[in-house]
């Protein structure tokens, strides 16, 4: 789910 704080995908997808 990406990086904490991004919720959906963030940086890591």
Curated annotation (Swiss-Prot):
Tissue: Hemolymph.
UniProt KW Iron keyword: no
The keyword Secreted is annotated on this UniProt entry: yes
Induction field: By bacterial infection.
GO BP terms: innate immune response; regulation of defense response to virus
Signal peptide (from-to): none
GO cellular component: extracellular region
Subcellular location, record wording: Secreted
Keyword annotations from UniProtKB, A to Z: Antiviral protein, Immunity, Innate immunity, Secreted
Other facts: Stimulates antiviral and antitumoral resistance when injected in mice. Enhances natural cytotoxicity of blood and spleen lymphocytes. Induces interferon production in mouse and human.
Assembly notes: Monomer.
Name under which the protein is recorded: Alloferon-1
């Amino acid at each position: 789910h990406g990086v904490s704080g991004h919720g959906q995908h963030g940086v890591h997808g």
